[in-house]
């Protein structure tokens, strides 16, 4: 059975690029914000990996990560954070809070694919 990736990013172009490169090997569920992603998760869906942007409307990605890691239902799902911020302190903080990886935007799609494969296969 194909693995499922939940992608949360308010930029539709990121979703399209990720779907092109990851969609051949994985099922992708996309939401433009964390609120809709949480609603989907609370319907009983369990992805094998979550990829989330940090800067989003409604609920920031770091708040989304914190919610996931504090919730028994979701705490074991690996999360990759995406950001255009090159802040070392932010990367360290998010990794300490439970993110398994932090990828800077713009990213190389092949690099994303390799990082995803290392985490969920």
What are the roles of these predicted feature ranges?
Residues 32-49:
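Acidic, metal-coordinating helix/loop segments flanking the phosphotransfer/catalytic sites
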Residues 12-30:
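Two-component/phosphorelay signaling modules centered on CheY-like receiver
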Residues 2-12, 18-19, 50:
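Conserved acidic segment of CheY-like receiver
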Residues 107-116:
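C-terminal output helix
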Residues 56:
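Receiver (REC) domain active-site loop signature in two-component systems and cognate sites
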Residues 53, 83:
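Active-site residues of response regulator receiver
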């Amino acid at each position: 059975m194909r693995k499922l990736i939940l992608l949360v990013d308010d930029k539709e172009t990121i979703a399209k690029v990720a779907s092109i490169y990851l969609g051949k090997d994985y099922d992708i569920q996309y939401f433009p914000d964390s609120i809709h992603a949480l609603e989907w998760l609370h319907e009983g869906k369990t992805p094998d990996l979550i990829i989330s942007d940090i800067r989003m409307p409604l609920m920031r990605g770091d708040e989304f990560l914190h919610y996931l890691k504090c919730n028994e239902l979701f705490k074991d799902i690996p999360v990759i954070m995406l950001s255009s911020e090159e802040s070392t302190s932010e990367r360290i903080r998010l990794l300490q809070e439970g993110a398994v990886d932090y990828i800077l935007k713009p990213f190389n799609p092949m690099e994303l694919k390799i990082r995803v494969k290392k985490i969920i296969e």
